[in-house]
From Swiss-Prot:
Function of the molecule: Transcription factor for the thyroid-specific expression of the genes exclusively expressed in the thyroid cell type, maintaining the functional differentiation of such cells.
InterPro entries: Homeodomain-like_sf, PAIRED_DNA-bd_dom, Paired_dom, Pax2_C, PAX_fam, WH-like_DNA-bd_sf
GO biological process, one term: anatomical structure morphogenesis
Major subcellular site: nucleus
Protein name: Paired box protein Pax-8
Keywords: Congenital hypothyroidism, Developmental protein, Differentiation, Disease variant, DNA-binding, Nucleus, Paired box, Phosphoprotein, Transcription, Transcription regulation
DNA-binding region as annotated in the record: 9-135
GO CC list: chromatin; nucleoplasm; nucleus
Cellular location(s): Nucleus
Gene it is expressed from: PAX8
Native organism: Homo sapiens
Ranges for region RED subdomain: 87-135
Amino acid sequence: MPHNSIRSGHGGLNQLGGAFVNGRPLPEVVRQRIVDLAHQGVRPCDISRQLRVSHGCVSKILGRYYETGSIRPGVIGGSKPKVATPKVVEKIGDYKRQNPTMFAWEIRDRLLAEGVCDNDTVPSVSSINRIIRTKVQQPFNLPMDSCVATKSLSPGHTLIPSSAVTPPESPQSDSLGSTYSINGLLGIAQPGSDKRKMDDSDQDSCRLSIDSQSSSSGPRKHLRTDAFSQHHLEPLECPFERQHYPEAYASPSHTKGEQGLYPLPLLNSTLDDGKATLTPSNTPLGRNLSTHQTYPVVADPHSPFAIKQETPEVSSSSSTPSSLSSSAFLDLQQVGSGVPPFNAFPHAASVYGQFTGQALLSGREMVGPTLPGYPPHIPTSGQGSYASSAIAGMVAGSEYSGNAYGHTPYSSYSEAWRFPNSSLLSSPYYYSSTSRPSAPPTTATAFDHL
């Protein structure tokens, strides 16, 4: 085959056994043979096996041929041939002037129809748009003689020459320091500059005053939104020239406001209270944070008391401590300092606990809500009612009768109670909880007779 010449180090064999060269397209003869076989009706897979060319290469060549009609390879990694020749550019300009609303794809089809370009040299749609944008529609600042579109302009339509635009000669010609300002592009002479330079040695220029030169120059004709004049910058820089951190030192402007927010007596009293909390002292606090706030102060401490709980005679099988439900086992005794505080509740042992609060409640008042984690005590019929105010919300013992509950508890539930609707019981989908009778014994099947 004509394409089986292999360069050392740059070629090889494909999966079909055909030779190829890396980075080089198929020869023209092989491309034409692929197209001829496709015209004869040979399938691309058969063309690939017969010519020993990969299926992807065959599909790419045929797809490009069906789309553009060309079998020439595309250039990879190189520059494309110049399609925007002067003749093509002039034709595109003529089409655009005749019909300004013509689209780029219509211009491309017209170039092919009139034979200006062929399938290989016709510019793409993006190239035509670029030609119209850069060459047909001449920019405003280019000379007139280089514009192709101005050759057929009517006498009544003229363009402003570029010499009418007077760009700024230097950045100093613009009063605002910008070369591309509106006044510079429009050629408007700017009046005297209203800017003044800041004197670095003047540290007392923080007052809001207008310079005599700035006031005499008249109103400003052009105000830029992205820059501020020195007249506007001076008031903004005044606080920073005085001090960078206004909260670091007290200034006359902040003194009145701080005195209104934080009175001096209140600050002093707060500091004294803070010192009292840091140092241990037995003296009660006598000063509050403010006059309208009051706090209760414990004036007289009480003598320590202990609660002694004795084990009842009835043995208990639980490992938890007995509830202080009966007043017969409670006794308030004043103990000395030698009694250690309790840490646990061992079963069948005496428990001592010290309380240094206010006057303790009576033995019966310690039950109920005062013991968290235990249910409220319900007295029996033999025990009297509670007269303490600590458990006033509970029901008195006299209201409970010693008799047992009159109604018998339910040991089982009937079907009618569980399903009040009788239609559910008669439904074939309902299965009763009663045991079903066992199935009758079946007779001997046919397997027994075999």
